């Protein structure tokens, strides 16, 4: 197994990582496993989750992939039950699921007065944002963090200890 970059021993701890099939959180998951944690990999793409779990286990770690929609409380509850049965109760939660949507973002970093006067369909300003796109981004980034935290932090609260990382 590669070097433990966290420089800590997490043996016996269970880490739940949302957004684990993404670039950033897959690296976090590997680091947690290298520190000795059993890692629950939550994400939308089971193929990527399985590949990551296989990679972690090939290095001697313990990891399981779970398809999870972090905006769906019932789905998160079901996954939490599976994690508890297979790995144990959550000690560490990394909330890494999130993202953006073209309907919920502008095409330019800054607004210029000329953008208001032009009718360029390639330029989307704050004033052109689609409320449904904004709603999706809000739900993904806010509710997609709130719901897993409500579910997995309950174990931590009952134990009186734990760690939550917001990415």
Predicted regions mapped to residue ranges:
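The beta1-alpha1 cofactor-binding region of Rossmann-like NAD(H)/NADP(H)-dependent oxidoreductases
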Residues: 46-47, 67-79, 131
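Catalytic Tyr-X3-Lys loop
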Residues: 110-146, 161, 165
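A short, exposed helix-loop element centered on a Lys and neighboring polar residues
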Residues: 149-150
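Structural signature of the Rossmann-like NAD(P)-dependent dehydrogenase/reductase core
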Residues: 17-18, 95-98, 162-167
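Conserved glycine-rich Rossmann-like NAD(P)H-binding loop of the short-chain dehydrogenase/reductase
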Residues: 37-51
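A glycine-rich helix->loop->beta "capping" turn
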Residues: 11, 59-62, 82-95, 101-102, ...
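Conserved glycine-rich cofactor-binding loop
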Residues: 14, 21-23
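Active-site loop of short-chain dehydrogenase/reductase
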Residues: 13, 61-62, 89-90, 114-121, ...
